[in-house]
């Protein structure tokens, strides 16, 4: 009984972090029932991954921006502009697809540097700079495209957003074994990482996670990864964009948790004056954050354009709102200083499953917008409630 009460106390203390996991699982179970099992069919799971990858890529950069106390309203327009530019490179000018992608990423970084300069060194609030960017880059995208789509793109380019890892069995086996191998390796890696981190915390007497909960968490991680692996391997295997996303999540999680730059981002968002007094070059942090956001927005634009096989003037409409919603649903604080890459990914998946589930049920876009708005409001209200409860208990 004492073990159960210990676990319960731990869960209550970590309600903010664990709550989004519970919400995601509950939403998946709900729509799996309402759609008579269609939600978790292999084809639909693959569709959810491919359709939401570019939003998740944007959410990685956006959570870093929001942790630092800023916001970026221009990412949807950057998606459109980079798609337009890459269309000119790859289709109109006939560049190799890989050269078009590299050049487009450079363009995205330059866009981020432009906005970062105004925010970091001129001192204009990010809201205003990126609002201006949203209008400017949308207009530039329409000018570059002359308000007409550019299509089709080279096969290599399209594969980035719509392709799958090669299947050596040519579809003759029941499960695509490359995906199975990657899934098993991913499960082993994640479990080993959790064990290593727990051992380090125990050695420093910092471990407060009950062992029973730790084992339950490990089992859940393994079952989740292997379950997704089975569903992907039952259809066409691993989408290339999922591999890109997984690498980004690993890299940026390490940056935020283990690097000096990551600690500077949290410090800048938690208390700007204290960060400056401690010697952190906050202007440099802000500048690099927007360069990074431009790079990731360009990558998201490439993924979206590749999936569409077309550069569209209206591409990216509303993407900034989806990315911001994913970050706040994933547990980031409105005031900055709090948030995680993993939380943003879970928030993005919640939005993606909601979109997909409501589409399967035949709900119109008006109802989808209504429900997503309410979910976002409830997520932020839950964050405010947790903060007020914490401050009351502290006093």
Where are these regions (language model features)?
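Cytosolic-side transmembrane-helix boundaries in multi-pass membrane proteins
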Residues: 1-29, 149, 186-219, 227, ...
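Single transmembrane alpha-helix segments in multi-pass membrane proteins
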Residues: 28-93, 114-127, 142, 256, ...
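Inter-helical junctions in multi-pass inner-membrane proteins, predominant
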Residues: 37-47, 146, 229-242, 253-257, ...
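Alpha-helical transmembrane segments within multi-pass membrane transporters and channels
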Residues: 94-135, 346-347, 351
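Loop-to-transmembrane alpha-helix initiation sites
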Residues: 126, 153-156, 172-183, 237-243, ...
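Transmembrane helix-bundle core of multi-pass membrane transporters
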Residues: 139-256, 313, 391-395
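Membrane-helix/interface signature in polytopic inner-membrane proteins
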Residues: 193-208, 250-290
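Transmembrane alpha-helical segments in multi-pass inner-membrane proteins
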Residues: 290-301, 307-373
């Amino acid at each position: 009984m004492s073990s159960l009460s210990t676990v319960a106390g731990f869960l209550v203390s970590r309600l903010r972090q664990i709550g989004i996991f519970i919400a995601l699982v509950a939403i998946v179970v709900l729509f799996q029932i309402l759609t008579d099992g269609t939600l978790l069919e292999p084809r639909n799971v693959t569709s959810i991954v491919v359709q939401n990858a570019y939003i998740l890529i944007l959410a990685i950069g956006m959570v870093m921006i929001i942790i630092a106390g800023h916001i970026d309203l221009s990412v949807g327009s950057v998606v459109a502009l980079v798609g337009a530019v890459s269309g000119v490179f790859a289709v109109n000018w006939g560049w190799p697809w890989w050269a078009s992608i590299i050049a487009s990423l450079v363009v995205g970084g330059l866009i981020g540097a432009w906005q970062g300069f105004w925010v970091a060194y001129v001192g204009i609030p990010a809201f205003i700079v990126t609002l201006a960017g949203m209008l400017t880059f949308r207009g530039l995208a329409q000018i570059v495209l002359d308000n007409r789509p550019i299509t089709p793109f080279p096969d290599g380019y399209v594969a980035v957003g719509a392709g799958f890892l090669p299947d050596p069995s040519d579809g003759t086996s029941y499960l695509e074994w490359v995906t199975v191998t990657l899934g098993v390796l991913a499960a082993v890696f994640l479990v080993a990482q959790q064990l290593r981190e727990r051992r380090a915390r125990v050695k420093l007497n910092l471990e407060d996670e009950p062992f029973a909960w730790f084992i339950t968490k490990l089992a859940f991680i393994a079952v989740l990864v292997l379950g997704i692996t089975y569903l992907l391997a039952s259809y066409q295997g691993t989408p290339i964009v999922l591999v890109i996303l997984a690498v980004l999540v690993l890299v940026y999680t390490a940056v935020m948790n283990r690097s000096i730059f990551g600690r500077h981002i949290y410090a800048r968002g938690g208390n700007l004056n204290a960060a400056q007094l401690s010697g952190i070059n906050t202007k440099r942090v802000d500048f690099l954050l927007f360069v990074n956001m431009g790079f990731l927005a360009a990558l998201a634009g490439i993924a979206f354009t590749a999936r569409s096989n077309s550069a569209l003037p209206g591409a990216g409409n509303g993407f900034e709102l989806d990315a911001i919603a994913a970050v706040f649903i994933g547990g980031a604080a409105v005031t900055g200083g709090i948030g995680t890459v993993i939380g943003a990914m879970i928030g993005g998946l919640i939005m993606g499953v909601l979109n997909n589930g409501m589409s399967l049920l035949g709900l119109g876009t008006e109802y989808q917008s209504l429900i997503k708005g309410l979910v976002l409001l409830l997520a932020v209200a839950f964050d405010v409630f947790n903060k007020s409860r914490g401050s009351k208990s502290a006093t």
